[in-house]
């Protein structure tokens, strides 16, 4: 009888420990689903993706993750794709709710100083004017750029407090567009001049912070975009949650 009681106690202990340490597969799946969902934008958005056309060739390797981000946007979103070139904004895809078509409009940047703009902010302002009026979607512009403005000199004031940057900020505020930016070096000054990098990143910080967006960069060199897109989605979701 004593042996039977001892055996029963051992079995009961094993069941208790086993039950406490195993999470049902359904619960694990739900937990994993919540984690994945937190890296995707949860509410429809009007998104303009602007890429500076003289960025280093490595930016071309980020087209896949950029396209995946676009295709993963929620139903009801619209996307525009454009390239910032010397003196012009090349709109590859006007705003469309066909996310696959928008993703397909991405192309590898020219990656040459022949395409270098004096600054990206004239074309940013032009793109802001193309956002659809009205509607319930939030308006966001993703600027992939080195941020550098040399149109009126090469010093901190001319680059970070430039006329065109200030005009872009005013236009964004008037039209309710938040600017988010990913830093990447260009084939020009920001590929070798640390002061140019500092000016460009500071300008991206300004245009993003003053329009309710956020700038993403790490150090002074090129960083792949995977982590940036995860943080961008998280930021959009957090800001969207506060807005509703």
What are the residue ranges of the model-derived segments?
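Bacterial N-terminal signal peptides
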Residues: 9-20
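Short beta-strand-loop
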Residues: 70, 79-108, 130-132, 191-204
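Von Willebrand factor
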Residues: 40-95, 123-124, 139-144, 182
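Solvent-exposed loop/turn segments at secondary-structure junctions
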Residues: 53-57, 85-90, 99, 109-116, ...
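Exposed acidic/Ser/Thr-rich ligand/metal-binding surfaces
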Residues: 34, 45-48, 64-67, 100-180, ...
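Bacterial N-terminal signal peptides that target proteins for export
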Residues: 1-11
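C-terminal "exit" segments of structured domains
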Residues: 198, 218-244
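Boundary at the C-terminal end of the N-terminal hydrophobic targeting segment
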Residues: 19, 24-29
